[in-house]
Amino acid sequence: NGFFISKNNKWKKTIVDEKYKGVKINKILKDCKKITYLKYKSKTPQSFNEIFENNYKSKDVVLTGQLYLPKKKGIYPVVYIQHGTGHPKGFVNAYHKIIEEMHKENIAVFIGDSYSGRKMKKSYWKLGLAARVYDGLSVLNTLSEHKNIDKNKIGITGYSYGGMVAFFTAYPKLLDLVSKDKQFAAYMPVYPGCDVVFKEPKIINKPMLMLHAEFDDYAPTIDCINYVKK
């Protein structure tokens, strides 16, 4: 039902996967109480042309992400985390640490999931960039309407392929077509690939921090440096 165990009456027989090492079970249970499962409707365009031409070849899909609020009441800014090629359930430990730190600052966290709603269980790389970006803009639409979220303080971050989502959702034309008058308040792409860009390099005038590793040879830094120079 999600990334965490929701019900298990045989705790003594439970074997915790190595990737969850360091996450204490009482903290997991505490976080489970804070989860709001949030549905958002998206599409699966095979290319950006489908978005630009408003001509989609696939049916709508309903995805479900996890919203972690610091408290059940109140209105909060939110950081939306978009996963990369790997399934988000594989990053529970890292997400838990981020959630914990964000909640100290009274900031909510939303974790997107582009795979489960599409019934994808392997070969995640087959989901293209256009579909992932559409998912990101759909999350923006949904979070903007949530009663506990400050619609003017929705930030986005992502890693690798998710970093490209955090980058491409800053393009004005895509925002206009999918999210109308809504925008993210801040962007933090982490080692995105900048080798795929639009001819018009202009992005919206919002803060963006792009993080890279100097010797990364998978998502080369130089591509993003050259893009910024444009």
Regions found by a protein language model. Name each.
Residues F3-I5, P45-E50, K89, V197:
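Short, solvent-exposed loop/turn elements at domain surfaces
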Residues V16-K73:
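N-terminal cap/lid segment of alpha/beta-hydrolase-fold proteins
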Residues Y56, V61-L63, V78-L143:
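Serine-hydrolase catalytic machinery in alpha/beta-hydrolase-like enzymes
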Residues P77, A185, P207:
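Alpha/beta-hydrolase fold active-site loops
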Residues I111-G112, G158, H212:
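Hydrophobic residues in well-ordered beta-strands that form the structural core
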Residues A130-I204, D217:
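Primarily recognizes the serine-hydrolase "nucleophile elbow" in alpha/beta-hydrolase
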Residues I204, M210-H212:
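Short beta-strand/loop motif that positions the catalytic acidic residue
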Residues P220-K229:
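Short alpha-helix in the alpha/beta-hydrolase fold that links the catalytic acid
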